[in-house]
């Protein structure tokens, strides 16, 4: 492995099952793919080498937000938050993740349909290495713009 970003997981979660990454496929005609009828949450997990432990950042809040996004998009899938959390943890364990990691939990309209379809809903969880940015260690300079957005009810 050249660096921390070369890591590809061996397994992913697809539609409620752990499958090898090479076998994880969705149709190119799936509305989630062709029309971006999908929602996702990006979740970070940080490896603590002193404690030999992976810590997932605010996983409960991320899953609640994913569930809310699914409601807003009217995706027809009952998401059990505890089971989804368990699935994420299980995936990290089976991939033997011991590095800072990005977890992408997503739900989408699967199979065949148009952009107004509400089902069938597919889901996937992937994780891959994403080290902390150099700015984490060195700091970053920012400025605040004085520009203000117009009110939504202005003409």
PLM-predicted stretches and their roles:
Residues 1-76, 86-90, 114-155:
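Helix-start/capping segments and mature chain N-termini
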Residues 84-113:
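Short, acidic/charged, Gly/Pro-enriched secondary-structure junctions
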């Amino acid at each position: 492995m050249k660096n921390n970003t070369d890591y590809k997981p061996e397994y992913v979660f697809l539609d409620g099952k752990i499958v090898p990454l090479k076998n994880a496929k969705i149709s190119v005609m799936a509305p989630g793919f062709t029309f971006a009828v999908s929602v996702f949450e990006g979740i970070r997990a940080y490896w603590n080498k002193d404690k030999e432990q992976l810590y997932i950042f605010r996983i409960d809040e991320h899953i609640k937000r994913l569930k809310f996004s699914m409601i807003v998009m009217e995706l027809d899938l009952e998401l059990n938050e505890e089971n989804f959390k368990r699935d994420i943890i299980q995936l990290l364990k089976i991939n033997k993740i011991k590095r800072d990691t990005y977890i992408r939990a997503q739900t989408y309209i699967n199979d065949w349909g148009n952009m107004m379809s509400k089902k069938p809903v597919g889901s996937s969880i992937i994780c891959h290495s994403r080290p902390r940015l150099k700015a984490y260690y060195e700091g970053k300079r920012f400025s605040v713009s004085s520009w203000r957005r117009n009110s939504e009810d202005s003409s």
